[in-house]
Amino acid sequence: MKNSEIRPEKLHLRKLRKSLRKIRMKCLCSGEQMRHREEEDKKSEVGVGRDYNGSSALSTAESENAKKLDNGNIEEAELSLRETSSLNYEEARALLGRIEYQKGNIEAALRVFEGIDINGITVKMKTALTVREDRKHRRRSKGGFSTAPSPAMSKHAVSLLFEAIFLKAKSLQRLGRFQEAAESCRVILDIVETSLAEGASDNVTGDIKLQETLTKAVELLPELWKLADSPRDAILSYRRALLNHWKLDPETTARIQKEYAVFLLYSGEEAVPPNLRSQTEGSFIPRNNVEEAILLLMLLLRKVNLKRISWDAAILDHLSFALTIAGDLTALAKQFEELSPELLDQRELYHTLSLCYQGAGEGLVALGLLRKLFSEREDPNRTSGLLMASKICGERSGLAEEGLDYARKAIGNLGKECSQLDGAARFVLGITLTESSRMAVTETERIARQSEGIQALESADMTNPRVVHRLALENAEQRKLDSALAYAKEALKLGAESDLEVWLLLARVLSAQKRFSDAETIVDAALNETGKWEQGKLLRLKAKLRLAKGEVKDAIKTYTQLLALLQVQSKSFNSAKKLPKGYVKELMSLELGTWHDLAHIYINLSQWRDAESCLSRSRLIAPYSSVRYHIEGVLYNRRGQLEEAMEAFTTALDIDPMHVPSLTSKAEILLEVGNRSGIAVVRSFLMEALRIDRLNHSAWYNLGKMFKAEGSVSSMQEAVECFQAAVTLEETMPVEPFR
């Protein structure tokens, strides 16, 4: 076939391939190699007419896959030629770089891409994207026809160069040059962001290929900054990806939101709070990493519920972690409740909700959910649910019997399959047995349950500091102080140095042994081990120990230090973040107790005005406090105002009928009055006090006074026994309750 007989489009295609090969050689080869390849090209041109039917312009040695790649890129080149009448240097490099990248020749591709003058073509690309083809941007030609100003670069060329910049970033990434890769990738976003600001939205989003490259670049940039060990730039890139209008599809946006939330939670880099350019007044602005992550994950869950994105269980896992460390488990429970029913099994939902409410301090709500679970015949979480229910019941004296039943069922379900769960079950069983012993009707039953509870605890995992701490607590409350001290020390050895309650118990046991200096040494050691915000309870105990040693001025000084700490703590947290409900309650209780302790000190010093001042501060915190009304009654009693004292004690019992100090104080005043007809009332008050707290030495002492007032021989004998019990208990009484 002669050259004249070859169809024009075939000749055009052959010339185009030849041009591409020459440009490719210029990009990849040295000068000598280039001359050698040009000679080969001339030889191949001589036989082009003869060989056309049986071969193509490509070498027969090239693989079929390479042919497909070249054909695709030639089509790109032809499209560029149609739009601009020429294929310029940058576009040719973009095409050839893509060919090398697709073949896996990363270093060769990078050499080609580095030949593109990015700075030189940036302005042209921005101009091409911002040109509008509407009427107000058109101009009149001489013939009166309306023509659009043609940009220096076509949209297709812009798309081609965007892809080249993106592939350059990917090449740098694969070669481990992450900083350069991120800077290259950022160029795409900078160009588009500037163009969008000038109203080029339709030009960007209207081109499918360009939008696809932009989406990939937006998603890649934060990952590159993370690889470059630049977390702050990664955070800024994530925010840029989510706050700008890139027209990303929902799934891509969801992926970016999830990855950003994960980075905020686990990277260890504290992000600066976002400075939002446009926000409605009163809108929520996250103040730290956790809040920002929670916001992102909650948005993702809402999209899942609205079926805008597919379900991803990891979202819920990360949100559970974030809300747990934020101390807002009630909010986590709400998120679970709002999930679509088909996403979670009903039994799993109830079990998770019960965990949330238990962690939030709403044990009774959790128990109600668990009771619903137990009605199911087949529940995979049954054993763990039984243990949780038993623990909840064990913390409430009125539900101890129910908790005992749950614990025994859990042990029965386990058998010998899981030693760890068996140890946990025996731990919970020990707690419920010792708690239920307090409600025992007879002394025999009480002792039997206490003994069984101790045995259950000792059969639990004795390498667990929580188990050993519980044994120390039970022995301390039974006044087995030597055993309690040994267990408390063992708990510290097992790794409970960070557990404030173990330090407190150890110091309280020492104070019960009247070793006040040793107890203060333990408190000082604990102060060195704990953080500043956790020192409140330790400082209060230290003040009580100093008071027990007769160091009243030092005790008042320590209380003043504690109040200053509480004031600073309250202001700091109020300005920084929302506190968990339980923590706020604990702070208020600690401040309230401090004012009450100071009031007692000033009453003993007969400084009535100072005592009244402390009680006034207490009233501001809790207007209806049985403890405060009891202290007011003590103040009136010390001043000889018995009627006012009786009224204060009565008010305290109206607020809390089980307030033991008010029961004993009211009985004491009735005994002082000396009305024999009131003996029955005194007896009822004291017996109720001992039913609630059988180790209260003041109740035993006043009961002895009551028997002595009766005057009979048998009553005198009972009085002696009561006085002996009171003395024994007072000798082993800690400066503050063991729990």
From Swiss-Prot:
Cited Pfam families: TPR_16 (PF13432), TPR_19 (PF14559), TPR_8 (PF13181)
Biased composition (Basic and acidic residues): 33-45
Gene Ontology terms, MF aspect: calmodulin binding
Keywords recorded for this protein, A-Z: Calmodulin-binding, Repeat, TPR repeat
UniProt keyword annotation of Iron present: no
Residue segments, region Disordered: 32-71
Keyword Coiled coil among record annotations: no
Tissue: Expressed in pollen, flowers and fruits.
PROSITE patterns: TPR (PS50005), TPR_REGION (PS50293)
SUPFAM superfamilies assigned to the protein according to its UniProt record, in alphabetical order: TPR-like (SSF48452)
InterPro entries: NPG1-like, TPR-like_helical_dom_sf, TPR_rpt
Compositionally biased region (Polar residues): 53-63
TPR repeat segments: 90-127, 162-195, 215-248, 465-498, 500-533, 536-569, 592-625, 626-659, 697-733
GO cellular component: extrinsic component of cytoplasmic side of plasma membrane; membrane microdomain; plasma membrane
UniProt xrefs under PANTHER family: PROTEIN NPG1, PROTEIN NPGR2
Record text on subunit structure and interactions: Interacts with calmodulin in a calcium-dependent manner.
Protein's recorded name: Protein NPGR2
